[in-house]
Amino acid sequence: MKMLDYVQLAHVRMGANLERSSELVAQLVDIIQSGSFDALRIVASGSSRHAADCARDYLQDALQMQVSVVTPEAFVDFEHTYPQHALNIAVSQSGYSTNTIAALDYMRAHDMAAVALTANVEAPIKEHTDIVLDYGVGVESVDFVTLGVEVLVEYLVLFGIYGGQARGTIDAKGVAQRLDDLREAIQANAVMCKTAEAYVQDHMLELSEHTPAMVVGNGPNYGAAEEAALKLSETIKIPAMHHEGEEFVHGPEMQIVPGYLVFIVDDPQGSERLANIADALSNVTTKTVLLTAHPKGRAHEVAVPQVAPLLSAIPNLVFFQTIAAMIAERLKSWDVHPYLDAVSKQMEVKAEGYEESVNALKAKAAECYGM
């Protein structure tokens, strides 16, 4: 299984998880219902944090409580006091992330309510918390995770829906409507797989140039922008930055010259401001893209299916994942520079046994998917 295979598998896995949605999140719903929690704090880094940022606004709307998303380092050093009376959810897809494990150790030492979410409940993370939950990824054997990102967004959304029902903030009719909205977002993700693949095929040469990239998005799509920048950086090995819309035009845009990659993710309801920014920048660099559910026929637009606004990251993520997977495969840019590789052990981010776990996942992938 290659990275692109997992990108294209995501909507299938999300669809399967939707069919068992109540069961999937039942334990976490029971936990938040049984405690006197006033807030939710998600502690995660990298792609898991970006997925949480994609779902944060949805969670706040559904649960009607404050939801914060912080890195493990920030949590341990600064962000552990407020919000008070919070349920802490620490996320590590691999279950081997040393920074997330350190955050869980802090929670345990300070008697803080904590749950770990992972795709591998037998990983070392299980030794550092009392409650470890599988969020439904199944098998993903590629380091540059994509399937796990969308599945985590979906899991958090489902937790918001059923948690909201348990807390009395969503009635039965609201649950049904929200599940339908999620189903439509998953279908939109499938559509965007094809849209993105066609886009890359049509723009292979310009996407293959080693130039900086800037990705812009607001709300849930800020999480998508974060993840897009990460994927472009780690796979194609280009400098990639992420910004909110107005932050972008308050200085960062001043570096743009012809040849830059600029991706602007439109607000779900359609933003005249973002559309105007994209129009302006298309006169500076021909590699400007406006990802929008409200296209007006301009050459730099890529159309996205309309979905419920707070679920917009679900179809938008796949566009960037597809670019990263296809261009990295074409350029064979998976490996880091030899000098960086030589010192990588000094910057290790995974607990002992991680490489063996990846090999085990590859064997499972061959068994599960026949690839």
Sequence positions of predicted segments:
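Short basic/hydrophobic patches in alpha-helices and adjacent helix-turn junctions
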Residues: 234, 280-283, 325
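Glycine-rich phosphate-binding loops that contact phosphosugars or nucleotide phosphates
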Residues: 33-176, 181-184, 218, 253-254, ...
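Active-site phosphate/pyrophosphate-binding segments
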Residues: 2-38, 131-133, 139-143, 147, ...
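Short alpha-helical basic/polar micro-motif
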Residues: 105, 230, 321
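Short, well-ordered loop/turn and helix-capping segments at boundaries between secondary-structure elements
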Residues: 165, 238, 268, 287, ...
